[in-house]
């Protein structure tokens, strides 16, 4: 209550912030006549002068802001015919300050972004503008590119399928447009390259994310993964799938739709054991079977075709639950995707092994400065602040919003609801008012389409199956008599322009067929109407059988429905019901926030390790004298081997050290095999003599050879480490049953695995170097196979050229090849 009176007297925090920008706004507006006086040729010269002043330290970037913003506004009016409104200037200042600008749909976010983009481009470090799809990246780069060009700035655009040279050129531009996936995957690929001239990115200075809620929140649960093939067989997936089809619900397993899990009963376990001919599926040796069974159950009873995925060209393709877009190339992890392929009887692809991965949360936190813009962010302000340190600023609209948002209408059954929806569409269609029907799944959009076809109502369907003309369909959705059915993808970023007589008819009507789990997604749908002061209306149609109502509606809501009394086909329109639904949505949002926060806690452990490894990789790649790193590794490795000798000196210990020296360092090349144990200094001298021989053979190629082996061993060990961390992550949740904190255990055990990784890299480097054979070649520089298909060798022009040959090896921490299941160093490696 007290805070309410404080806001009444002093205004909200947002109001106070907006008021504080008035002096800057006045400065920009006062410069309008000065900028108008400049000729077209003087504009780029003026911007170049600002850049020089900044780089010479004569003025700061904040001091330049009013003049740069005024110059951009004038140039935009001349080139694009669009002049920035004051609210867009406010948004631009907020973006420059590293905030999220919430601006209503249709208020001109794309144009607003040009202000901070140009200002920060003066630093010469590259500004990245991140969009949700290739179409918007290409459109915005071409559209705003004309403005940037008039100012003397260059623009690059990233789209899928570009070559490395084209990508490098795009990143070299002052401003680079691209999707979040392209930026993230380029970062991962750069950290798999072998030569500095292969890198495409040039740092992470400033990024502005369009539809920031979609990228930083909706996609936060899906990490970017580059993977390589695995040798594991896929037959188990089809075998288990056949068994699952014969299990009976309730008797053999139970389904928790709310938690999205399926629990196998004792009877179900017996059925599986009989079918597979095993005694106990819960025996530790059958852990893989347990995993396959649970994933198959999930595939059959939690994941729905045309809702969570579609089947296209003999493949299971994921449908993004928030945008309704297809996600080709993405795969569910932990064998779930293979279980879905077995369920749909398409080709089951082999499980892939992770070679590199990062979450969007950790990728975008690498930028020195991050900003975002969207029409709907305020409902997630807490998450933006806690995870990204980003403050949400609500920018007032240029014109008052006059859209009418009607109360929800609720029916008993889905059938009654859909009948009412079709009836409402027919009535609106008769009077010519355009309707945009929003659905949360492909399944629902196709059901309504089928019902409308039976009534001979002409309409367009826009979902993941029919998305080729997305922008065109959405742009036409505001014309007289148009009926458009769209999933959540709904052409975000594309303006719906109202036809000439549509304003008199009441504008575009938004008809929601179901409430989404997130209020923000519902608000996005509503925001398609009533843009820039246009008229419009919206209404959601619900039923007690909708997933949100069924799974998350409270008992209080059910009781309220009974008291209100519902006849068949009769809807209820009640503010208390709408509030109860909103309360259910808040609970789900809170649940999803905790999931994302938990994922980030785990990924932060991996992120620290990734940062260390990628920094090490960068240092190796750019070190003109990589022998310094070799010497450091040698000292560390010899210290590890000889450390126990400092406290004890006995035959068994001597024998163990002797074995390690000959096994890892291959000392038989430079000294006779006997029981004499060299001192640490003698061992170091002997090993360095092997490097001297290598140097004399490799000649000018020596440093390149050192770098290559160091990088290849690092990549090989990192790949194995990622697999080990995946295994640790999968099983760590069980620690909770032992009254231990799974996150703390993951951190501790992850650190132990990381220490082993560093030891493995050191050992692998010396196993390789001490077993290298260089064969002199006429035409080819020392050739090597990349660790994966995503690495491409750089061109070299050198006279002395060699072929590198390596022998197969077993690392001390690898599983012993004898099949015991122990590590090599604890098994055959002891001897």
From Swiss-Prot:
Uppermost EC category: translocase
Cited InterPro entries: Helicase_ATP-bd (IPR014001), Helicase_C-like (IPR001650), P-loop_NTPase (IPR027417), SEC_C_motif (IPR004027), SecA (IPR000185), SecA_CS (IPR020937), SecA_DEAD (IPR011115), SecA_motor_DEAD (IPR014018)
Enzymatic reactions: ATP + H2O + cellular proteinSide 1 = ADP + phosphate + cellular proteinSide 2
Cofactor: Zn(2+)
Any one Gene Ontology BP term: protein targeting
Keywords: ATP-binding, Cell membrane, Cytoplasm, Membrane, Metal-binding, Nucleotide-binding, Protein transport, Translocase, Translocation, Transport, Zinc
Presence of keyword Nucleotide-binding: yes
Cofactor comment text: May bind 1 zinc ion per subunit.
Domain of life, source organism: Bacteria
EC number(s) from the headed UniProt entry: 7.4.2.8
Binding residue positions for Zn(2+): 816, 818, 827-828
Gene Ontology, cellular component aspect: cell envelope Sec protein transport complex; cytosol; plasma membrane
GO molecular function: ATP binding; metal ion binding; protein-exporting ATPase activity
Residues annotated to bind ATP: 88, 106-110, 495
Matches recorded under SUPFAM superfamilies: Helical scaffold and wing domains of SecA, P-loop containing nucleoside triphosphate hydrolases, Pre-protein crosslinking domain of SecA
Disulphides: none
Principal localisation: membrane
Membrane topology listed for this record: Peripheral membrane protein
Record Gene3D superfamilies: Helical scaffold and wing domains of SecA, P-loop containing nucleotide triphosphate hydrolases, SecA, preprotein cross-linking domain
Cellular localisation: Cell membrane; Cytoplasm
Subunit structure: Monomer and homodimer. Part of the essential Sec protein translocation apparatus which comprises SecA, SecYEG and auxiliary proteins SecDF-YajC and YidC.
Similarity comment text for this entry: Belongs to the SecA family.
Stated role: Part of the Sec protein translocase complex. Interacts with the SecYEG preprotein conducting channel. Has a central role in coupling the hydrolysis of ATP to the transfer of proteins into and across the cell membrane, serving as an ATP-driven molecular motor driving the stepwise translocation of polypeptide chains across the membrane.
Protein name: Protein translocase subunit SecA
Organism expressing this protein natively: Lawsonia intracellularis (strain PHE/MN1-00)
